[in-house]
């Protein structure tokens, strides 16, 4: 049996901008992607904490250090700049692997600077905002 599990998430991210004319996706600062163990073109589920909206899209690499979280295309209608969102990726694995897998959680501040990260079930790793 194959199960769909949380692979990683960026928690407390703030939308920095939107571009309705772009074909679609979410642009995320490359440094945040690396810390959260996410990759370009990966499918994401985004939850808007301000209005409850949930939507799927895919990741585009943003400029490293920019702290950009930009919604593009139709997704730009799902959240406004300043809205707090959670960005999640998922993986498919067999039940044996799923029982021991520990997702990566990256927590950012209100400016999308990385604060800390951890694998669920493990201690936080404090991060410097100068990453």
Swiss-Prot record:
**Could you say which cofactors this protein requires?**
pyruvate
What is annotated as the active site? 25, 58
An example Gene Ontology CC term for this record: cytosol
Recorded hits in NCBIfam families, A to Z, give: panD
Recite the UniProt cofactor note for this protein. Binds 1 pyruvoyl group covalently per subunit.
| Transmembrane region(s) | none
Pathway assignment: Cofactor biosynthesis; (R)-pantothenate biosynthesis; beta-alanine from L-aspartate: step 1/1
Residue(s) carrying Pyruvic acid (Ser): 25
Q: How does it assemble?
A: Heterooctamer of four alpha and four beta subunits.
What's this protein's name? Aspartate 1-decarboxylase
The protein's organism comes out as: Chlorobium phaeobacteroides (strain DSM 266 / SMG 266 / 2430)
Q: Where in the cell is it found?
A: Cytoplasm
Q: What is known about its processing and modification?
A: Is synthesized initially as an inactive proenzyme, which is activated by self-cleavage at a specific serine bond to produce a beta-subunit with a hydroxyl group at its C-terminus and an alpha-subunit with a pyruvoyl group at its N-terminus.
Which reaction equations make up its catalytic activity?
A: L-aspartate + H(+) = beta-alanine + CO2
Q: Cite the InterPro entries for this sequence.
A: Asp_de-COase-like_dom_sf (IPR009010), Asp_decarbox (IPR003190)
Q: Which residues bind substrate?
A: 57, 73-75
Q: What family does the database annotate?
A: Belongs to the PanD family.
Q: Which GO terms describe its molecular function?
A: aspartate 1-decarboxylase activity
Q: What is its EC number?
A: 4.1.1.11
Known function = Catalyzes the pyruvoyl-dependent decarboxylation of aspartate to produce beta-alanine.
Q: Which GO terms describe its biological process?
A: alanine biosynthetic process; pantothenate biosynthetic process
Q: Does the keyword Transmembrane apply?
A: no
